[in-house]
Design a protein with these regions (language model features):
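Alpha-helix boundary/N-cap detector
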Residues: 99-102
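Amphipathic, charged-and-aliphatic alpha-helical interface segments
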Residues: 83-90
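Conserved motor-region signature of P-loop NTPase helicases/translocases
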Residues: 1-70, 74-81, 95, 109, ...
Length: 192
């Protein structure tokens, strides 16, 4: 009898791997990929990276929407549609500030606290505090392949802590530089 680990799919390039990976996962077949991945593009890293951007500057609509819709906060797409219906003009942050009461009041309080922490804590302590207060590390651990996702998030936090020696703005600049230079590459080399 054959086992899953008796088979190997070799591809000429990495570009098509996502299609194969999705098809194999859909069929319930475990997939091992030895690829270099952009950590910043991982679906379980993007919300946390967006949170850092929003703490640094909340007037960024796309990161703010990503944070509001993430497992860190209890909002849905319907909440954002309702908010936009009430405040169709201006930025999303302006709508949250002026049209989102009382539904978004807890978010605004949390964001104010996170921004205060960002001004007073070193980045490594800030990251630990954010993970603890949002429960995001636990949420990521509950995903399929949670152990790998947790490991990725911890790797991202270690990278951000070293990049953020000058504070949160340093982390944001480092993320932007990594994006311009092709991403934050990490060898995932595990179950995917």
């Amino acid at each position: 009898p054959c086992r899953y680990d008796d088979f190997c799919i070799l591809l000429r390039g990495r570009g098509d791997f996502a299609v194969y990976e999705a098809a194999l996962r859909t069929a319930g077949i475990p997939v091992f990929a030895d690829t270099a991945a952009d950590l910043l593009d991982e679906p379980h890293i993007r919300p946390f990276a967006a949170l850092l951007r929003v703490i640094d500057n909340p007037a960024q609509d796309i990161p703010l929407a990503a944070v509001l819709l993430s497992p860190m906060f209890p909002y849905t797409a319907d909440d954002l549609v309702t908010l936009r219906g009430a405040c169709p003009e201006g930025s999303l942050y302006g709508a949250v500030l002026y049209g989102g009461q009382p539904r978004f009041a807890p978010f605004l309080e949390t964001l104010a606290e996170f921004r205060r922490l960002a001004r007073t804590l070193p980045v490594d302590a800030l990251l630990e505090e954010l993970l603890a207060r949002t429960g995001y590390l636990a949420a990521v651990g509950a995903l399929p392949e949670g152990a790998r996702c947790r490991e990725d998030l911890q790797s991202f936090c270690a990278w951000a802590a070293s990049a953020g020696r000058t504070g949160l703005p340093g982390v944001i600049r480092a993320m932007d530089a990594a994006r311009q230079n092709g991403g934050l590459t990490q060898n995932t080399g595990g179950q995917t």
